[in-house]
């Protein structure tokens, strides 16, 4: 993991956007002047396709485990497996693919790797089998109540806890947390879900069922503007959005330093826009685009 900075970002798509990070990370290391000096990459999270322990999103990552671990080792970055299925049963713990992934992540890093979990059953299993893997309490638990968050933060098995994005604006309450609990809070910054959604947990449960191979229909979102899908501009208008200036002027001074960027189910072009917005100085954003994909012969239409 990088030398601790004021703000640590936890980035999406370890397997899903391997090719993007293969191009971005050399630039990030060789041209640190392009990027804000008050932030660093804390981890990259994701899962390959076909993982029954997976949750949150249906993974479609095509990179091999060897490629991913080699990239993480080269840049000293922590990798997190997103295993946040909420409906796991005891028989699922024997899954060969997921066990092999945990074994490789436990043994294959230059810095500690971790697992994002929802299921207590899985969390207990991982602690017994691979104590070297740290655990992150998933936002799929939909912790919208401050008392619930405090209870989760008090659990010693979790190094980090990601509350529901609707707790993001509750800074007056969040400031009352002791410093050791503030250090565990990881805010989901750029969620585009409707702030008034009452079916968020049900939506995640549908993904869990599909990852287990159950034949069930997709969750039908009832948000007023659901048909438009994810738009970063829409996420920015949410009361739960945490932008760059929010991080610098509100959250860092309050003692919080971990910020999660969502995007595993999106396209790599949009994830690059997240990297530009959250990490890149405005005067260098064009240079980053040119290095990653933009050239003088690129046609959009």
Positions of predicted regions on the chain:
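Active-site pocket-lining/capping segments in soluble small-molecule metabolic enzymes
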Residues: 1-148, 152, 158-301
């Amino acid at each position: 993991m990088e030398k601790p900075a004021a703000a640590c970002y936890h980035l999406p798509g370890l397997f899903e956007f391997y090719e993007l990070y293969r191009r971005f990370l050399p630039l990030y290391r060789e041209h640190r002047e392009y990027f804000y000096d008050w932030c660093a990459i804390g981890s990259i999270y994701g899962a390959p396709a076909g993982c029954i322990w997976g949750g949150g999103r249906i993974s479609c990552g095509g990179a091999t485990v060897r490629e991913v671990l080699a990239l993480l080792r080269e840049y000293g970055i922590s990798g997190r497996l997103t295993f946040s299925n909420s409906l796991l049963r005891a028989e699922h713990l024997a899954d060969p693919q997921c066990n092999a992934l945990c074994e490789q992540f436990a043994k294959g890093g230059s810095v500690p790797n971790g697992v994002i979990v929802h299921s207590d059953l899985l969390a207990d299993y991982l602690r017994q089998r691979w104590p070297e893997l740290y655990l992150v309490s998933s936002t799929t638990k939909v912790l919208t109540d401050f008392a619930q968050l405090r209870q989760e933060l008090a659990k010693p098995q979790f190094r980090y806890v990601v509350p529901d994005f609707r707790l993001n604006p509750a800074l007056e309450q969040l400031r009352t947390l002791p410093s050791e609990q503030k250090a565990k809070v990881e805010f989901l910054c750029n969620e585009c879900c409707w702030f008034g959604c009452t079916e968020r947990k049900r939506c995640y449960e549908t993904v869990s069922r599909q990852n287990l191979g159950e034949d069930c229909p997709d969750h039908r979102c009832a948000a007023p503007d659901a048909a438009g899908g994810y738009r970063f501009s829409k996420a920015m208008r949410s009361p739960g959005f945490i932008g760059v200036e929010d991080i610098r002027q509100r959250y860092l001074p309050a003692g919080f330093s971990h910020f999660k960027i969502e995007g595993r189910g999106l396209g790599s072009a949009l994830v690059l826009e997240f990297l530009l917005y959250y990490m890149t100085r405005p005067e260098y954003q064009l240079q980053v685009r040119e290095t990653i994909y933009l050239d003088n012969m690129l046609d959009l239409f």
